[in-house]
Amino acid sequence: VLIQEDKLSVIDFDDAGFGWYGFDLAVAVWDRLDFTATGCHFDIAYEALIEGYLEECPNTEDIINTIPTFLLMRTMMIIRWIEDRPEAGYESFIPVLIKASIDQAKDLELLN
């Protein structure tokens, strides 16, 4: 559970990857990315998560460094989830998510 002022958010560990702690952390903050909604304050959520994680698990910078890659993977997984479930009615989000994944890949220097 993440707590922000008077709001609680639940981490859905069903989406967590076995043994990939960076993916677990990416899932926890993915819905705070700017393209998912307005006013999500990703930087604040990300920094708070990292600070808390490093406090509990010091010397895990190698895990922290994987989070941007896992954020990209999560975005691509959501695209696939939407494509597989047209009855859910989220197709209109696909172009936004594709653009976001391209931007994430560029930030990771995977694309020019």
Language model feature labels by segment:
Residues 1-6, 49-52, 56, 104-111:
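Short charge-dense sequence patches
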Residues 1-23:
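Active-site acidic catalytic loop and adjacent metal/ATP-binding pocket
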Residues 10, 14, 37-38, 64:
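Residue-level detector of alpha-helix boundaries and kinks
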Residues 20, 41-51, 63, 96-105:
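Generic hydrophobic, helix-prone segments enriched in Leu/Val/Ile
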Residues 59-71:
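All-alpha amphipathic helical-bundle segments outside canonical DNA-binding/catalytic cores
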